[in-house]
């Protein structure tokens, strides 16, 4: 699962989930994904609500080839599934939102890269979801994420309002406000601390309560 692979009910095939950090792709990456879908599947892509792309009906024996093809354009499947930090999502208008105090994309990218393959979050009790919102409109939907960051500027310092503990599982919950303002250079240390607590003290017996 941590390699972005889910089994399907149909025998001998599986679903591949591709991470699209903060919902941004280059034209080369999109072309590569399309070519891989044509070659290894049925030429159809499923775009998810959390800015991933899924390819269904991939032959089990050809999966390593597919991984290698995607890697040629730095497209990753790693930790797109399983009890890891899932795809870091962001407002779809990040970078050109007229209401944004700044572009959240570089911060989402830095957080994504820091926690990808990070040993502190490889065997958690449950998956962990993070989002970035460009403005108070909260188009990144921070209130339904484990951690949500909403762009803010205070005294000419870039930072974020931080939301924690949201979810849409079997027991849906609106996130709480953890910080009204946290400087941008503190978001990675904050998330690392939250992950360590979640990993050590989080529910592991009942997935519905995790």
Can you annotate each of these PLM segments?
Residues 1-6:
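Intrinsically disordered, low-complexity polar/charged tails and linkers
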Residues 8, 13-157, 189:
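Small-residue-enriched alpha-helical segments and adjacent helix-cap loops
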Residues 122-210:
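Mobile "lid/hinge" segments at catalytic clefts and subdomain interfaces of large enzymes
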